[in-house]
């Protein structure tokens, strides 16, 4: 027996056990005796200790026979040599008495309760052995009414046991502070917002409260805590680059509900309303269930065989008539690594062309490019987990609480605990009230602002000389550039007082460790890549690379946008980021694939459109992307698609893009297939099929594999683990990845032999050897130069929490009941000048086109700036966006659009709209 | 010139007026002029020239124990601020005087606010707190107005603000008003409230706000009366002050006597220098005519009740009766109760103990914050059961079940409210069980589980 009391040993009912520094008594018991050995009502693994239910009480003593004290084990720190008595008669009586009191005010309709069999109160009551309730009935809360106002969240507070778990989940997990306790003592009760319904409150429906509630007092319409399901499958969310793990409950082929696994390193019991609740699109009647072939302008249902034959015939013909370069492919960041890998292989091997691209083009291509130039690797240098260790957070051009909700919550939690936050954004995003610094610049002036930011770091002498000298190159040029800055001109350009920039720069540079997050507000500009490189400069000049709590972290938009690029869905780099026009690489690829391949860089997506219009691109294959709705300058995209001879689209739904196709292939959604997604922190995670593909559909990987085989391109039958094994052989940083060793938590690449992952990149040296500084002088966007005089407003676009991109999926879920349309945010001063009021229909027009939508007067934007989202096809905002793009990567400049705005007279509104107004 | 008091409100000869010197004094107003005429803020001037540690040492030497209820040594509390602390330090004056039977702080706030301010500024200086809050309960609206005016006056005279009296010490005091909750008198609940949150008392650790309190910074929470004593300790010196009262029970304290005596009211006496018998018979003029003493709650409603005919065995072997108990901290504790907040409630033989405990249980059920299950549910059940006993509808077994509810609250909650609400019930039942059972219906013995309860327990009720 271990008796060394000088170390971390304590006793559970007389038995000596090791404990960890910082353990509470309950954590210690849980670890050695299993969760539930000591019952509790108010404690939950995802929440801070609370100590209110007292059911977890134990007796403690410093000697085995010494005087004992009753303490709540959940918040009592363990000390060496402590004796813990978990089930003395006194404790058992105490627990029984408490639960008995709770039951005096709890309905006993257990058999018909949705959580029957999974109710923590029920379990605890059973465990402590309640046989009777001795107290005569009296005042109680059994008649509280149910809240059924919300498409997802429900409450039935007669079942509430006042444990405050929901309030704490709202505060500590989500950080929304919607739920609170009202009244005191026996009259204490949970309220939402200002004692409103879920629907009327500011609830963001993340469901953290529902998952935390030990009873059915707060739940959801899917009864996610019921034990009705026959199977629970762990998989990864398809909605954004955070990569939340999901536990999906199913019965047969029906998806019942989704919860977030408590042990997930990525999302620790948390996820947002998209991951948790927006899954009903899966069996939506609109799902495509049969291949469609366009004959004479009309779609006709076909069998898979017919469709494959038709495709193979046409592609073969075009290849023969116009050469392989007349074919192109657009892969999808929504699909798995395996599917993306096969897609690029299909195009490259099948047609001997590098005309393969993916939707990263329109979001984070400047990140991949810029970070490769600076560091050698186009991916996040650190992990989200590093937020726990950082001393300062810088967010440039990102709105994480809407776009990356779980990461947004984590940032908010850290900031609420005192970590200073700097937000560089033209809008007052949700995090701004929490931020110490908000640099509200004019859209399109990132480089001007960040140059000034870097200048003030230099001026304050806060650079890391040692790091610069040992780890970087080209510093002198960068320093010279900064020293030559014209601060007056910069200040005029970006519009933020220089003192504010200076204060923020000093905050960032003087922190022991600072993390820089960025999003599409950085990349989707004509100087997107340059901005990324300037952020990299700032991180390097302050030594914020290569250790915990620092780094440059792009908030990747789509669930697998990292993976799509990793897998080679880029025209200039093949699988594993090997340059296709490099001789050695070209040879490597040709040998690996045993085929003749092109060593010329292919077309990027915008170039494909131009090539189509020029008659050079004849056939295009689009896997899971709605380019008509999401790519800029819609009319231009449409005419390009019209100019194609042959278009194949793999889709879940008949999207505006699929409408242009010659063949539409019905694909399976993420819940219906297996594979891997790589999240924004390079974490390769297993996606597990939750249900089989709905009848008539196939996974995207299966489809590509089928067509490859049909066209005689050598490819083994499709299995996700088989393709992963092939990937591991060609992609250097996947070398050690196997289906098995990715484990439930996933592994961050580079993955070494044995499946060992990498949390932090560039620890001792950069991937490219030395980190390279780049200095760029601000240049005005051509969009502003050309059109600002005629169209004096700057429109910038973004996303909201409730909808995902063009909303193909979320508009077919309950989310559509929460947010029903896109709105245009306009500053009150501008609105007054234009005679616009909130709710008015307005016309936004640029030299490309126009779009009508409702206005929302808001100070989230400065005068002269307009903001809207792009989720609804009814408000096709890309009608007005421009074809201007990042010089290096051709990522479109969605964030700076010269427009004008005017109120639409009621008579010129569409008829349906008028009817609604009148009603 | 001798101090003149309002006719009929003159201090009793047995009193020793330090803190209440100016209460009911003819011509004395809450204004700073009155206070200055009386030598006000002179001790602040003295203190500002002292070493900070010397002030703390004087307070330690004085033996001053907190007058809010717990009787914790004030100087020791001040010493808990971590020496390595780099965060701001706060002082909070707990003016949430809400313990039933206690009514001393309100007189200080209403009539002599500058005495509090002077003591508090000295305390701030001693612990290097540049910011202090006076948390005044909602039910004292006038007090808040008076104290705010006093703060403005003190500021105008340079006793607050930047560089007080050229000492280089900056200090600001603010009044914060409660919203009507007893729990805000609990120091961590008060801190939460001051932070703008629901006043749920905090879990331990941290064990003392002096380590982590307001805004997670070291915070000293002292009662109004305790802070007033600081001024007098500076004036007299700690050692001299300690000569007042009895060893370990030094200084003076204000007793708030209510109930069935001829002259209820406030009496400032040297701690331990008067007995309970003297309080009743000498200070308060005895019991009401023809009435006999039945019971005493000696230190605010949360302290355990004492029976008139009880005998108490002291550590030194003496056995004393209730009238012989000296009014101090230690003897009162040895007698199984506590000196608490100084609220002495005298009950004569006309009082029904069942009614009294029911009255208290109603109060505590109303004031439980609702955070901890045993207290939230238990305090209500204590009320429900004692309601039933009072109405004569109870079984004698109900008295035992009432006791068992109290037993499972005590020591099983985050804050001391658990004890505060269960001690009265436990002690009343222990000492007046027969009387309470006598108020019940004997024929109901064995029937305490009502029919509905039985059904509910079987899991059959809707």
Please identify what each model-predicted range represents.
Chain A
Residues 108-146, 297-298, 462-498, 575, ...:
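N-terminal leader/propeptide and maturation segments of large enzyme subunits in energy/redox metabolism
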Residues 107, 163, 168, 224-673, ...:
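Catalytic alpha/large subunits of respiratory electron-transfer oxidoreductases
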Residues 693-751, 813-824, 829-919:
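Long, contiguous, secondary-structure-rich segments that constitute the structural scaffold
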Residues 12-15, 251:
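Short strand-turn-strand beta-turns centered on an Asx-Gly dipeptide
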């Amino acid at each position: 027996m271990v008796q060394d009391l000088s170390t971390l040993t304590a006793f559970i009912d007389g038995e000596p056990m090791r404990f960890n520094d910082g353990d509470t008594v309950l954590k210690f018991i849980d670890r050695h005796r299993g969760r539930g050995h000591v019952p509790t009502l108010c404690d939950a693994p995802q929440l801070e200790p609370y100590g209110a239910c007292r059911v977890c009480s134990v007796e403690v003593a410093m000697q085995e026979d010494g005087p004992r004290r009753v303490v709540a084990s959940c918040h009592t720190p363990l000390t060496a040599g402590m004796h813990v008595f978990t089930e003395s008669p006194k404790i058992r009586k105490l627990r029984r008495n408490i639960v008995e009191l709770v039951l005096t005010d709890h309905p006993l309709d257990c058999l018909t309760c949705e959580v029957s069999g999974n109710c923590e109160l029920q379990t605890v009551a059973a465990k402590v052995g309640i046989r009777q309730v001795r107290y005569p009935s009296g005042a109680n809360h059994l008649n509280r009414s149910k809240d059924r106002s919300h498409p997802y969240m429900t409450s039935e507070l007669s079942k509430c046991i006042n444990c405050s778990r929901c309030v704490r989940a709202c505060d500590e997990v989500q950080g929304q502070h919607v739920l609170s306790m009202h009244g005191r003592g026996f009259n204490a009760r949970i309220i939402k917002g200002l004692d409103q319904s879920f629907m009327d409150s500011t609830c963001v429906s993340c469901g953290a409260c529902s998952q935390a509630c030990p009873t059915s007092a707060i739940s959801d319409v899917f009864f996610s805590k019921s034990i009705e399901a026959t199977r629970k499958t762990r998989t990864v969310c398809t909605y954004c680059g955070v990569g939340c793990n999901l536990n999906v409950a199913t019965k047969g082929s029906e998806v019942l509900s989704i919860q977030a696994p408590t042990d997930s390193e990525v999302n620790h019991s948390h996820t947002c309303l998209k991951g948790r609740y927006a899954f009903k699109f899966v069996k939506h009647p609109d799902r495509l269930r049969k291949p469609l072939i366009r004959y004479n302008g009309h779609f006709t249902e076909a069998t898979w065989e017919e469709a494959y034959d038709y495709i193979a015939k046409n592609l073969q013909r075009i290849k023969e008539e116009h050469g392989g370069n007349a074919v192109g492919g657009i892969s999808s960041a929504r699909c798995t690594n395996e599917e993306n890998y096969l897609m690029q292989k299909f195009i490259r091997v099948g047609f001997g062309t590098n005309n393969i691209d993916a939707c990263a083009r329109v979001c984070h291509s400047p990140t991949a490019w810029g970070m490769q130039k600076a560091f050698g690797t186009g991916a996040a240098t650190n992990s989200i987990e590093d937020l726990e260790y950082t001393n300062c957070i810088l967010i440039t051009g990102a709105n994480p609480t809407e776009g990356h909700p779980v990461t947004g919550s984590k940032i908010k939690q850290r900031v609420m605990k005192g970590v200073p936050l700097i937000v560089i954004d033209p809008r007052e995003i949700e995090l701004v009230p929490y931020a110490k610094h908000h640099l509200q610049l004019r859209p399109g002036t990132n480089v001007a602002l960040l140059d000034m930011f870097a200048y003030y770091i230099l001026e304050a002498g806060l650079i890391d000389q040692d790091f610069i000298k040992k780890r970087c190159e080209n510093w002198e040029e960068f320093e010279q550039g900064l020293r030559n800055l014209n601060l007056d001109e910069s200040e005029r350009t970006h519009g933020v007082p220089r003192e504010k920039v200076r204060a923020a720069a000093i905050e960032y540079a003087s922190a022991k460790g600072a993390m820089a997050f960025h999003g599409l507000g950085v990349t989707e500009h004509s100087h997107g890549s340059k901005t990324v490189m300037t952020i990299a400069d700032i991180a390097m000049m302050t030594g914020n690379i290569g250790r915990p709590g620092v780094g440059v972290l792009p908030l990747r938009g789509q669930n697998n946008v990292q993976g799509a690029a990793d897998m080679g869905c880029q025209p200039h780099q093949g699988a594993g980021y090997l340059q296709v026009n490099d001789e050695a690489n070209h040879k490597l690829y040709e040998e690996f694939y045993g085929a003749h391949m092109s060593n010329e860089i292919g077309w990027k997506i915008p170039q494909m459109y131009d090539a189509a219009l020029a008659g050079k691109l004849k056939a295009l294959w689009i896997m899971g992307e709605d380019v008509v709705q999401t790519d800029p300058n819609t009319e231009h995209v449409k005419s390009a698609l019209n100019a194609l001879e042959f278009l194949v689209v793999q889709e879940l739904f008949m999207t505006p893009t699929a409408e242009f196709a010659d063949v539409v292939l019905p694909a399976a959604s993420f819940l219906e297939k297996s594979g891997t997604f790589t999240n924004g922190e390079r974490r390769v995670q297993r996606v597990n099929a939750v249900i089989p593909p709905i009848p008539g559909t196939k996974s995207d990987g299966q489809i590509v594999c089928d067509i490859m085989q049909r066209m005689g391109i050598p490819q083994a039958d499709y299995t996700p683990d088989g393709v992963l094994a092939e990937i591991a052989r060609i992609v250097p940083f996947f070398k050690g990845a196997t289906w098995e060793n990715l484990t439930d938590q996933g592994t961050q690449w580079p993955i070494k032999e044995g499946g060992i992952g990498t949390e932090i990149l560039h620890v001792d040296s950069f991937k490219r050897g030395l980190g390279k500084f780049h200095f760029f002088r601000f240049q005005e966007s051509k969009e502003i130069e050309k059109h600002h005089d005629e169209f004096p407003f700057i429109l910038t676009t973004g996303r909201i929490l409730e909808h995902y991109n063009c909303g193909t999926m979320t508009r077919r879920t309950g989310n559509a009941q929460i947010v029903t349309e896109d709105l245009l945010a306009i500053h009150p001063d501008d609105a007054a000048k234009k005679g616009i009021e909130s709710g008015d229909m307005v016309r936004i027009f640029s030299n490309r086109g126009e779009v009508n939508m409702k206005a929302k007067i808001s100070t989230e934007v400065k005068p002269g700036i307009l903001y809207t989202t792009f989720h609804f096809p009814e408000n096709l905002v890309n009608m007005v966006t421009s074809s201007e793009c990042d010089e290096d990567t051709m990522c479109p400049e969605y964030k700076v659009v010269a427009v004008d705005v005017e109120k639409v007279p009621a008579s010129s509104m569409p008829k349906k709209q008028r009817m609604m107004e009148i009603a | 010139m001798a101090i003149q008091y309002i006719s009929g409100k003159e201090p009793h000869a047995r009193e020793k007026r330090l803190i209440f010197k100016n209460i009911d004094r003819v011509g004395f107003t809450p204004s700073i002029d009155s206070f200055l005429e009386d030598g006000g803020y002179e001790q602040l001037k003295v203190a500002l020239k002292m070493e900070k540690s010397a002030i703390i040492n004087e307070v330690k030497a004085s033996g001053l124990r907190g007058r809010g209820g717990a009787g914790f040594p004030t100087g020791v509390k001040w010493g808990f601020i971590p020496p390595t602390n780099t965060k701001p330090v706060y002082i909070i004056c707990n003016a949430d005087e809400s313990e039933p039977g206690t009514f001393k702080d309100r007189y200080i706030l209403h009539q002599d606010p500058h005495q509090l301010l002077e003591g508090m500024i000295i305390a701030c200086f001693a612990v290097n707190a540049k910011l202090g809050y006076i948390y005044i309960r909602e039910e004292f609206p006038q007090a808040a107005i008076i104290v705010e005016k006093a703060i403005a006056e003190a500021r105008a005279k340079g006793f607050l603000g930047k560089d007080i009296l050229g000492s280089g010490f900056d200090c600001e005091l603010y009044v914060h008003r409660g919203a009507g909750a007893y729990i805000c008198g609990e120091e961590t609940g008060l801190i939460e409230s001051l932070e703008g949150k629901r006043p749920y008392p905090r879990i331990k650790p941290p064990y003392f706000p002096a380590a982590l309190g307001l805004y997670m910074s070291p915070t000293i929470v002292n009662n109004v009366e305790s802070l007033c004593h600081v001024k007098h300790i500076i004036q007299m010196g700690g050692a001299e002050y300690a000569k007042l009262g009895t060893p370990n029970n030094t200084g003076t304290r204000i007793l708030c006597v209510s109930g069935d005596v001829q002259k209820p009211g406030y009496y400032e006496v040297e701690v331990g220098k008067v007995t309970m018998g003297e309080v009743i018979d000498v200070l308060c003029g005895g019991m009401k005519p023809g009435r006999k003493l039945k019971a005493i709650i000696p230190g605010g409603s949360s302290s355990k009740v004492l029976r008139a005919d009880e005998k108490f065995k002291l550590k030194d072997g003496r056995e004393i009766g209730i009238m012989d108990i000296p009014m101090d901290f230690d003897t009162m504790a040895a007698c199984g109760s506590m000196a608490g907040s100084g609220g002495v409630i005298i009950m004569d033989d006309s009082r029904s103990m069942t009614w009294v405990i029911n009255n208290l249980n109603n109060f505590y059920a109303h004031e439980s914050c609702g955070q901890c299950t045993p207290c939230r549910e238990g305090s209500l059940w204590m009320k429900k059961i004692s309601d039933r006993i009072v109405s004569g509808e109870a079984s004698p077994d109900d008295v035992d079940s009432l006791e068992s509810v109290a037993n499972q609250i005590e020591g099983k909650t985050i804050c001391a409210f658990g004890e505060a609400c269960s001690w009265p019930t436990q002690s009343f039942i222990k000492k007046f069980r027969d009387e309470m059972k006598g108020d019940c219906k004997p024929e109901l013995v064995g029937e305490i589980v009502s029919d509905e309860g039985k059904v509910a327990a079987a899991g059959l009720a809707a």
